[in-house]
Amino acid sequence: MQGGGGVSCAVAGDAPSSTRGGGGGGMLGLTLFDPPGGEQPAERIGRLVRESPVVIFARRGCCMCHVMRRLLAAVGAHATVIELDEAAEEAAASAAAAAAVPALFVGGAPVGGLDGLMGLHLSGRLVPRLREVGALCG
């Protein structure tokens, strides 16, 4: 990830690419702290959560973030993964009402961290909820 308060996005299961601006590897080229049109970071995060069926706020190198991505990929879910640097993490936590990273949102509603995801999965409610918001492959 490039320094200076940026954020990168990749679809769960894809390896992030070093290219920007929609290049290969699922990279969306999203910059959180330099958005076009004057959109503030909190507004941009809120919009991403509302517009995407499944959003994971993650940190590169976080083992819980990796487990969350792998579980969603294993059940066939399309997820938008937003990797935050330390400066962006504070804004995301504030804007998205997330206490910590990883933070998962399904259908615009907060699920929580890895414990919330595992609770849904073990109770058998994860796949139906993902299907309901249109996040499953196929």
Curated annotation (Swiss-Prot):
InterPro entries: GlrX-like_pln_2, Glutaredoxin, Glutaredoxin_subgr, Thioredoxin-like_sf. The keyword Disulfide bond applies. Disulfide bonds join C62-C65. GO terms for cellular component: cytoplasm. Transmembrane segments: none annotated. Residues 17-40 are annotated as: Disordered. It is found in: Cytoplasm. PROSITE patterns: GLUTAREDOXIN_2. Signal peptide: none annotated. Keywords: Cytoplasm, Disulfide bond, Electron transport, Redox-active center, Transport. Residues 42-137 form the Glutaredoxin domain. Coiled coil: none annotated. Has a glutathione-disulfide oxidoreductase activity in the presence of NADPH and glutathione reductase. Reduces low molecular weight disulfides and proteins. Belongs to the glutaredoxin family. CC-type subfamily. This is Glutaredoxin-C7. The lineage of its organism: Eukaryota, Viridiplantae, Streptophyta, Embryophyta, Tracheophyta.
